[in-house]
Amino acid sequence: MAIPKAHYSLAVLVLLFVVVSSSQKVCNPECKAKEPFHCDNTHAFNRTGFPRNFTFGAATSAYQIEGAAHRALNGWDYFTHRYPEKVPDRSSGDLACDSYDLYKDDVKLLKRMNVQAYRLSIAWSRVLPKGRLTGGVDENGITYYNNLINELKANGIEPYVTIFHWDVPQTLEDEYGGFLSTRIVEDYTNYAELLFQRFGDRVKFWITLNQPFSLATKGYGDGSYPPGRCTGCELGGDSGVEPYTVAHNQLLAHAKTVSLYRKRYQKFQGGKIGTTLIGRWFAPLNEFSELDKAAAKRAFDFFVGWFLDPLVYGKYPTIMREMVGDRLPEFTPEQSALVKGSLDFLGLNYYVTQYATDAPPPTQLNAITDARVTLGFYRNGVPIGVVAPSFVYYPPGFRQILNYIKDNYKNPLTYITENGVADLDLGNVTLATALADNGRIQNHCSHLSCLKCAMKDGCNVAGYFAWSLMDNYEFGNGYTLRFGMNWVNFTNPADRKEKASGKWFSKFLAK
C-alpha cells in the first residue's frame, strides 16, 4: 500500500527535498537544460506558451495604495505614527497612491496592461470601523469597494479579493490584542461574511489571509511590523510563544471562514476560496552536507509547512512539534478536521530562494530562530542568483518549490499571487532611470519561463499576478522600494507613468 506523504520519515522527506532541489536547475522559454535561464529575447517569449484559460494579473493591497482617508485606524496607522523610526524614510500609508480617490485610474492602468485579473484587498476598518458587526457597518466603505469591483467588471477584469492583508483594526488590538486572542476568530469570520454578502455576487475568488507567516514573525517575533511585540520590545511580548499563537489563530479564522463560505455561499455564488502563503525555497549551503540538507528541509517546514501542513493534512509538521514542543498550540480533533482541506486553491507569493545551513540552538527562544537554520544569499561569496536592490532572486527556485509542493502536498490548484522585484529609491533616482526598469522585465520574464517549465512538469498552476501594479507603500521599507510596473509620484499620486516593464507586460499579454 502507498504510504501517505504526511507519514514519511524525516530521512525520506529530506531525500525528496534534495532530489527536487538538484533537479530542474535551469529554466528558459523552451525549458531546455542550458544556460542562461533568463530570457534572451523578451519579444519572442509571450503568453501563447501558457494555456488559454491561464490567468494573468497584477496585485496590490489596501494599506499600500488606498490612503487613510475615510476609514478607521488600523494597526499600521498606529504603528507608523508611534514608531516612525521603524521605517527607513519615517513614512506611512496615509496617502500612498490615493487609490481611494483614484481607483478609476488604477483600473485604467490595469486595462492598459491587458491583464485579466486584479488582486486587491479590503481594508477591514474601512467597512467595519469598530472591527466587528456590532460596531456598525460603514456604508461609505461598502460603496467604495462596490464601485471598484463594478469598475473592474465593466472593464473585463476579474477581482481576486484578499480579505485580510495585515491591517487589523486598531480597536481590536486595543480591546483584546488582535490575533493574540481567540476572540478574533469570530470577529474575522463575521467580517468575511459581510464581504460575501455584499460582494460575493461579483467576486468569485476569495483569499482569506496574506502570508500569515509574516504577521506572526514580524509582528510578534522581532516587532518590525504592527503591533510591534517581541521579547524585549517596548510593548512587551514573548517571541518564543506569541508568533505560534498568532499563526494558530489565523489558521482557525481561515478555516472557520472557509467552512462558512462553503456551507452558506459557495453553491449559489459559484466562487472559490483559498489563502496565500509565503513561497520561499531553500537550498543546502553545502550540497554534500547532510546537516545542511536537513537544515533546508527544516527551513521549508518552519516557513511554509507551518501553514501548508495543517491546511492539507490537519496538523503541524512533525519537526516543528518536536523542536517547539508545548510552545506550539495543538489542534483539537474538531479543529484539525476544520483546517484540513480548507483550500479550494493555494495562493503562493514567491520572491527568493536562500541557502540554508545548520545552526546551533539559539540562546533565546524565538519562533524566527527555532528552526536552527542560518539563511543567506551567498555561497563562498557568490550570489545564488541575480543581485537586485531588494534581494537576490533565483528563478529556478520557483520551479523547484512548485514541484516540491506538487509531490508532497497533493498538487493543489495554485495561483502565484505575488512575484516581482524592487528598485531602490532614496530620493536620488531620476524619472528617466525609474522608467527604464529593464531589470524588472528580466525578473518577470525569467520567472515566467520557470513557471512554464513547472507547469510542463505537471504543477497545477492556474494564474500569475505580478507584484505590483504600481509603486506603493512597501510596509517596513516605506517608499524606498519600488516594485511597480507603473511609476507613482508619491507627493502627487495622480501623476503615474508607465515603466518599461509595464509596456513589456502589456505586449506579453497582447499576443
Curated annotation (Swiss-Prot):
The record's comment on protein family reads:
Belongs to the glycosyl hydrolase 1 family.
Q: Which organism is it from?
A: Arabidopsis thaliana
Q: Could you name the active-site residues?
A: E418 (nucleophile)
Please report the name of this protein according to its UniProt entry. Answer: Myrosinase 4
Q: In UniProt terms, what function does this protein have? A: Hydrolyzes sinigrin and, with lower efficiency, p-nitrophenyl beta-D-glucoside.
Q: Any additional notes? A: It seems that the absence of a catalytic proton donor in plant myrosinases is not impairing the hydrolysis of glucosinolates.
Q: Which Pfam families match?
A: Glyco_hydro_1
Q: In which tissues is it expressed?
A: Specifically expressed in roots.
Disulfide bond entries: C31-C450, C39-C445, C230-C233
- UniProt cross-references to Gene3D superfamilies, sorted A to Z: Glycosidases (3.20.20.80)
Matching InterPro entries: Glyco_hydro_1, Glyco_hydro_1_AS, Glyco_hydro_1_N_CS, Glycoside_hydrolase_SF
Signal peptide range equals 1-23
Q: Cross-referenced PANTHER family, in alphabetical order?
A: GLYCOSYL HYDROLASE, MYROSINASE 4-RELATED
- At the top of the EC hierarchy, this enzyme's class is hydrolase
Cite a single GO MF annotation.
beta-glucosidase activity
Which UniProt keywords are given for this protein, alphabetically ordered?
Disulfide bond, Glycoprotein, Glycosidase, Hydrolase, Signal
Reaction(s) catalysed by this chain's protein: a thioglucoside + H2O = a sugar + a thiol; Hydrolysis of terminal, non-reducing beta-D-glucosyl residues with release of beta-D-glucose
EC assignment: the record states 3.2.1.147, 3.2.1.21
Q: Which residues are glycosylated?
A: N46, N53, N428, N489
Query: Which example biological process does GO assign this protein?
Result: glucosinolate metabolic process
Binding, a beta-D-glucoside: Q64, H165, N210, Q211, Y351, E418, W467, E474, F475, F483
Taxonomically, which superkingdom? Eukaryota
